[in-house]
Amino acid sequence: MTVLGIITTTLDVAVILIVFANTTTLAGFSRDEVLFLYGAAGVSFALCDLLVSNIDRVSQHIKAGTFDTFLIRPVSSWLQLTTDRFNPNRLGRVLQAVLVLGYAVAVLDLEGRRLWMIPVMVVTGFVIFAALWTLVGAAQFLLTDAPELGNAFTYGGQQLTQYPLAVYARDLVKGVTYVLPMAFVNWQPGLYVLGRDDPFGTPEFMRFLGPAAALALVLAAGLAWRQGIRHYRSTGS
């Protein structure tokens, strides 16, 4: 199944390669630069999908009456849910993303003094996706059909970050920069690594705000999760 996972996710890379079979740049970015952005976001998302995504099964446990079992144990309910039914088959997506990122770093002429940002952006992206999944899980205490809606923010966010944000409308980019900080998964820090200016004209210091944006989203997600737990009513109550 790991091999199947690699083949499935490789289709995303194939789409990028097909695009560049017909053009030399995409919104001013070369093929290898796009692969770099894709790989960086892909590693973050794939690790989060592997380790955290089970949090979106909250509504299933509530409907089945099994969520109470997570509350009576002396371990964080969030931690229990994320480790519930660990699926190693998702390792294929992680491996594929690592390979793409490694290739892009190897072929791009990157300045050595900027490479420190790569692990920072991968960790930051992981935290942002984890916070998004936590918000989706928290919403399920009120909306039992939230998983489908939540996919628009988690898997949809992953799709959004596969390409340079320069391909999207300015208003959308503002939204994913100042409201839902998806731009800090790979776009803003990626511009620093690539030595590129932001086509939208954001100042240079924005390249380094990823950890702060991730922390703010984590605090919001933590608050939402605690509120969800506080307002949860057992099926037996």
Q: Whereabouts are the PLM-identified features?
A:
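Hydrophobic transmembrane alpha-helices and immediately adjacent juxtamembrane helices
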Residues: M1-S237
